[in-house]
């Protein structure tokens, strides 16, 4: 809208993300700042105690709780991006999750594109922002985004020319595209780890030996080569390779024999008394295939029965 973008915009935006009553999904992205977690959890209420301040319009000072080599990488996550304070407060309070500031005609940003229209569950259209600082290098006049829930449908739309870009390729198609050397396929490193979270408040998952047995019984190499098939690499530690300044000292092995030993030490020499486990996964054919494969691995390696349940995410 022509307003200057300043360091103070970032300070206010980060305060908003950390405001407890907003209920932000990713406040922990900023927990590396001094006092950020305490502010978000209500231990302190004065944001000036948090390790971020604007020294002038173009200088931001950040104080971290400890050396964080990947901090600059974290700032590429959208939860850390600035929002326009005046627009947010024009249509509500700092913690208003239903404010109209995100609607077309109201939304103000500092990016190369502006929000033009938003048809819920149909289409989002953004148009070139003439006030963007580097607008002359923005080649596109508009971009259209379509929410497609089925990845196979999305892949067919891409091949039919209805989409110019898709970030999701069905695993069974990705393997074929890789073998063919399809020039439309591009695989880039992704800073993320695919994992299941165990409910440690229920038996027998409250037993660490049971949890270790479950993870040792998963053949990650097979998962990436035979199931996902799109360039993923086995996750032998929680932090993915490529994280600046981090190299895991140990790796999680695939060791069914050790898994069975740990299960016996946990009191399950026979799995007849082991309760049926449930894997809850978000609706997607690829997620279903991974869940099915892990279900089979746990059954074959440990004799454990597993039920699968999907839910929209």
Give each language-model segment a name:
Residues 2, 164-165, 184, 299-313:
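Periplasmic binding protein-like
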Residues 2-4, 9, 152-162, 179-180, ...:
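Short helices/loops that flank or line small-molecule/ion binding pockets
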Residues 10-13, 60-61, 111-114, 124-125, ...:
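Short, well-ordered beta-strand elements
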Residues 10-14, 62, 143, 210-223:
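Bilobed periplasmic-binding protein/Venus flytrap-like ligand-binding cleft at the lobe interface
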Residues 36, 47-48, 57-58, 63-142, ...:
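Gly/Pro-rich hinge or "lid" segments in bacterial periplasmic/extracellular proteins
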